[in-house]
Amino acid sequence: MKTAIVGLMMFGTLLCAEGESTDIRMPDIVLDAIKHCECLIESGECNPNVIRINADEEAQRAAAAGFAVSGHLIKCGSSEQCSMQAQALIDGGITNLDLGPYQINYKYHPNPMLHEYFEDTSAREQANAILTKLVKSFGYSWETLGRYHHFSATDRTRNERYYRKMYAFIYGNNTNSQGSN
């Protein structure tokens, strides 16, 4: 009877793991490299309270609507402010947004709990889930890791620049590897 119960539990775990994106844990150094490449660095520190509007026309529309857009960026004073501004942008139809320290794209990875994009622990878990799905789809390689920043396989040079930044961070040569493209 015990064997049957244990077997059922293991079978259930395997079934759940197949659909679950967090059954593989990315190494911390990889998640650290993602954050290093994605997060806006100000005064040597990561500023997690950032919204990036990806499309030029949407950034212009947001600026015209009164948002404090500088280029494509909106800097907020806190995660609460960022959550409110992100919600207002989304309500206005602007959804192609990269949010928080891991610059997770709302359009492709929507989460109604917007504050979680700006909180390091929950954003890190979401970044782990995104990387896990990419690895399951494309295998574990530098090219796959480069897809975190820019999914398009047609823009291989952009992906390559990104994973080279990650590589430099991981292997200690990060003098010119800060910031996202």
Language-model features, listed with the residues they occupy:
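Positively charged n-region of N-terminal signal peptides that target proteins for export
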Residues: M1-A4
